[in-house]
Design a protein with these regions (language model features):
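Small-residue (primarily alanine) positions within well-ordered alpha-helices
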Residues: 116-119, 170, 177, 390, ...
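Polytopic membrane enzymes that build or remodel cell-surface glycoconjugates and lipids
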Residues: 1-431, 452, 463
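Small-residue hotspots
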Residues: 147-154, 163, 170, 295, ...
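Conserved alpha-helical positions within TPR/SEL1-like repeat arrays
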Residues: 389-396, 424-434, 459-466, 493-500, ...
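Structural signature of tandem alpha-helical TPR/SEL1-like repeats
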Residues: 369-375, 400-414, 435-449, 471-483, ...
Length: 633
């Protein structure tokens, strides 16, 4: 049975995608955004729950509102737990579905199989798209694209209700879809050639405006908008050109590109000239080759929300932002190449296949960098300069790897040197220094800097308290824990840590009192330590150890012929450990040789036997003393 050509193309798409991305089944989560969205998010880690669903619908954590994306992460946890490989594969499956849907959409709209397939394969396999697919935290990209393509497909079919539903779901996945109405207008121009149907799209523009307002409000409230350098028009214009260049030569890709201190004016001028020239040519040729204008303005329009005119975040640009915009450039190449090489179909096919194979090869290598945080950020440091985010995250990862603290400190020190105002990096450097012999005071200094830079966060106070406790400055540590709890009463584990510090204070006071010759007060302090923290075993252990010390001193005094001193030491030992049978027995022995102390000695022997009925020495000593007593007593 012969399969239809479209089905073969879909199957080849799926095979190519899984050939490139199947390796991610063995990958870990990374320490950049994955903790906020999945691994350290208590709501997501519970899986699907009623409370979690309500949180997903209302949460603006991490300066974003995308409830559908949050629910998808919860569903992953519900189905697969915290197995990172399955979380990766779910993103791959969504990417595969979006790629197939893109092909079917273009086929439906244009009827041109080969160019439609080329665009779909470029979308599926381009190295710039690896970040969106291989990064668990970028689930929002693949979900947004899937709903975007569904809305376009429904529009081509004339199913208006589905267009609205898909658009709303897309907005709830990632607000970048706000430009959907513009892409529908471009479809009207080409390939549908319907003329502009603006009126029917007014509800979609209203939804887009609402989504844009929500996004701006949430990101400003979450601190994602950089108020010190809010507008970045120069970098935005240059970035458009860089994105085009990276599409055709995807080398030196990294998870983070540092924002430049300044953008050279001549770079901006060249970018403006290039963008204007291409735009003018696209408009000029809109009659003969309308796909050029449709593709070019798709690229410009869909990239506009994230191009950085209003700065959101610290990055200059990001590979993931090209996930949907690249389709416009691919359309220009696919249909333009078809026209230019119409007389050479074999050459056209060979070039298309070669381009797709090259994309797949580079993408496969790029996917490999996402294996874990070390491979990801080490590669970023190789292909970028002054990358403080890569230094910071690599250092944080290495802090948790056995025997690699010196490397961690090196990377974290570079991070704070490159970006002195990065409070989290100072905090993480402090953690690494606290684990480095002889660097505890340096760690405390870093935590002080972090507290200054992050005055609204309880985390630096917790880290400071941990370091102060490690340094033995327990009263100061207790005060920092109290500050952290005032700022965040539900801060995980802080109450337990503060209890341990308070218990340690009583424990150390007890030890000091014991050494100072105040056993009763010492025992009371040790008991208080146990009352505060029942898991605080050291108090009991120390009490027994101190009892043993005084017991041995008593033995030494007895052997040296100093019974009074021996009795005092045995009595002190019993204050620390009242159930010390040997101390009762030996106290009885020294008391039995003291005039008028026979009854006290007998009481000590009897207590030793009560504690240890099989204690033969105590029994023999008791019998011997009772036989020596005068009759009638």
């Amino acid at each position: 049975m012969r399969l239809p050509a479209d089905l073969w193309i879909c199957l080849l798409l799926l095979a190519a995608i899984f050939g490139v991305y199947a390796q991610s089944r063995q990958f870990a989560f990374v320490n950049y955004d994955d903790p906020d969205y999945v691994t350290a998010n208590p709501h997501v880690r519970q899986g699907i729950t009623a409370d979690g669903a309500l949180w997903a619908l209302t949460s603006t954590e991490a300066a974003n509102w995308f409830p559908v994306t949050r629910l998808s992460h919860m569903l992953d946890v519900q189905l697969f737990g915290m197995d990172a490989g399955w979380h990766h594969l779910v993103s791959v499956l969504i990417h595969a579905a979006a790629s197939v849907l893109l092909f079917l959409l273009l086929m439906r709209a244009t009827g041109a199989r080969a160019p439609s397939a080329f665009v779909a394969f470029v979308f599926a396999l381009h190295p710039l798209h690896v970040e969106s697919v291989a990064w668990v935290a970028e689930r929002k990209d693949v979900l947004c694209a899937l709903f975007w393509f569904l809305a376009l497909w429904a529009y081509v079919r004339g199913w208006r209700a589905l267009v609205i539903v898909a658009f709303v779901l897309g907005l709830m996945s990632k607000p970048m879809i706000v430009t959907l109405p513009l892409t529908l207008l471009l479809l009207d121009m080409w390939p549908l050639k319907r003329g502009l149907r603006l009126r029917e799209k007014l509800p979609l523009f209203a939804l887009a405006a609402a989504g844009a307002v929500v996004t701006i409000v949430v990101q400003k409230a979450g601190g994602a908008v950089n108020p010190a350098a809010m507008f970045g028009l120069g970098n935005a214009l240059v970035s458009y050109v860089v994105y085009v260049a990276k599409t055709f030569w995807p080398a030196g890709l990294a998870v983070f590109y540092p924002y430049p201190e300044r953008v050279a004016l001549w770079h901006v001028a060249l970018a403006v000239a290039a963008l204007a020239a291409i735009s003018w040519q696209a408009i000029r040729l809109r009659g003969a080759r309308p796909y050029l204008a449709a593709g070019w303005f798709w690229f410009l329009a869909t990239l506009l929300p994230v191009i950085g005119i209003v700065r959101v975040g610290e990055q200059a640009r990001a590979d993931r932002y090209m996930y949907v915009p690249m389709i416009g450039l691919a359309v220009m190449v696919a249909w333009g190449g078809t026209d230019l090489l119409r007389k050479w179909p074999r050459l056209r096919g060979a070039l298309a296949i070669g381009a797709c194979v090259a994309c797949a090869g580079v993408a496969w290598a790029q996917v490999g960098y996402w294996r874990n945080s070390e491979t990801l950020f080490a590669h970023a440091l190789e292909v970028t300069t002054d990358n403080y985010i890569a230094e910071h995250n690599l250092g944080t990862y290495l802090t948790d790897q056995p025997g690699r603290l010196p490397e961690a400190v090196t990377h974290l020190e570079r991070a704070v040197r490159l970006q002195p105002e990065l409070g989290q990096a100072h905090s993480d450097l402090g953690i690494a220094l606290a684990g480095t012999p002889g660097r505890l005071e340096d760690a405390i200094a870093e935590f002080r800097t972090a507290m200054r830079l992050r005055p609204d966060s309880e985390v630096p106070h917790i880290n400071m308290a941990n370091a102060l406790a490690q340094a033995g400055r327990l009263k100061e540590a207790e005060a920092e824990y109290e500050t952290a709890l005032r700022m965040q009463p539900d801060a995980p584990g802080v109450k337990d840590r503060m209890a341990r510090v308070t218990a340690e204070m009583h424990f150390q006071t007890g030890v000091a009192l014991a050494k100072g010759g105040h056993p009763s007060e010492a025992a009371a302090e040790l008991d208080t330590a146990v009352e505060i923290d029942p898991a605080y075993k050291d108090a009991h252990k120390t009490s027994v150890a101190l009892a043993q010390t005084h017991y041995q001193a008593g033995i030494a005094f007895a052997q040296a012929g100093h019974p009074s001193d021996a009795a005092a030491e045995f009595q002190t030992a019993l204050r620390f450990d009242p159930d010390f049978a040997e101390a009762h027995n030996n106290l009885g022995v020294v008391l039995s040789d003291m005039p008028g102390k026979e009854e006290e000695a007998i009481a000590q022997f009897r207590e030793a036997l009560r504690l240890r009925p099989e204690y033969d020495d105590a029994r023999n000593n008791l019998q011997s003393l009772e036989e020596r007593r005068p009759p009638g007593r």
